Amino acid sequence: MIKTKVAAVLIGFSTAMSGSMAVAQDKELIVATDTAFVPFEFKQGNTYTGFDIDLWSAIAKELKLKYKLQPMDFNGIIPGLQTKNIDAALAGITIRDDRKKVIDFSDPYYESGLAILVADNNNSIKNAKDLSGKTVAVKTGTATVDYLKSQVPDAKLKLFPNIDNAYLELATGRVDAAVHDTPNVQYYANTAGKGRVKVVGTVKSGDYYGIAFPKGSPMVAEVNKALATLKANGEYEKIYAKWFGKQP
């Protein structure tokens, strides 16, 4: 009798789990992204593209998921996940303990860090300590804001909802520096900002991006399996090399 009950419970649990993914496969998922974060996600013509976009496309193909990309400001993504208005999000979201209290993350898929960007003729700022007393452009709601408030409390932070606006503020001389995620800073310095700005150093390293989900989402385990598969079969390396020009 006991064995029968245990078996029934296990069968029920298995059915519930497979049913959760079946629901995910049947419905069109809303996947949020901040499309002003080159080269991870941005709009090219009428198409959304970037490392995160390609990675999610590969994951969705692996799991046979239907989805719709929902562009939104970065600072609206976590509230959207908390209210379950969105099913998942990829936007260079740093995995942090405070965020883990309100949302869930996949396994890390990219190691990042922060870098300092200054005008090309600026030779006075070379590291984080030099930001003390300076006006620094940063993106609202990011780990950069928390880090600078903690480590360089005398820096005067100027907040922007869009990192492109922060870079423009620097390029036009209205701030002393901009600090943001290393790959995005380097991309801007080598493209739109070339000849006007330069990267003078990293602020910190060891940050990781994760795909974000509402708390308790059954998709986390399945997405982690898909990530592992993509890394094992070489697909992740192909996507990485496409956007960063090197192997991870």
Give the residues covered by each predicted segment.
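Ligand-binding clefts/hinges and TM-proximal coupling segments of bilobed small-molecule sensing domains
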Residues: 143-160, 197-200, 225-248
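Periplasmic-binding protein-like
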Residues: 110-118, 182, 186-228, 246-248
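Sec/Tat signal peptide C-region and signal peptidase I cleavage site
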Residues: 18-26
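Short helix-initiation/N-cap motifs at beta->coil->alpha
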Residues: 68-79, 123, 140-143, 158-168, ...
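A ligand-binding cleft/hinge motif common to bilobed small-molecule-binding domains
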Residues: 92-101, 147-150, 171, 176-205
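Alpha-to-beta junction loops
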Residues: 30, 64-66, 82-91, 134-135, ...
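Flexible hinge/capping segments at coil-to-helix
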Residues: 119-136
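Extracytoplasmic small-molecule ligand-binding "clamshell" domains
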Residues: 26-92, 101, 233
